[in-house]
Amino acid sequence: DGNDRTEAAVLKMLTLSRDKATESPDEVLGKLNIVPLTISYEIDPCDVMKARELAYGAGYEKAPFEDLESIAQGIQGQKGHVHIHFGIPLNQASLSVPDAVSLIDDAMVANYRLCKTNFWACEALGYAIDESERGRAEASITQSAFLARFDELSEAERQQALEMYARPVINMMASK
């Protein structure tokens, strides 16, 4: 949904193989050298599929092999500009799960490379965006072509698709 968050349960699982007699979960988590990784796409090749699924929530029924098709589309589909950012490793002597979640989430928001598509989605949803906040990167797609991707969607699906693209801008502005 464009609102990427660290799942605390996954971090807790990483601490399960510790020697419970000699190591605390916080010590183990601190030693793992977790590196926050942020991948920013100008275009999500699965945006329409995700929007349909998210718009209908629990009432959505997947077609046979839809997950496999989504994976293939995600790998092979056009993404436009892609930015991969490796953050600073989390290697404190002791690191609690809530602190790790907060550090990783903050790094993802700070290191996300906003694209013009993110700002176009905000505009389409009625958000006022300061000119100084806009992405400086050249777009590999025009604004009209980007918005046309959602022409065949229902209003609820279109809203969901635009929110997926707008969410990184909203998260970044909220963190300031």
Question: Where do the language-model regions lie?
Answer:
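Membrane-interfacial terminal anchoring regions of lipid-handling membrane enzymes
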Residues: 1-176
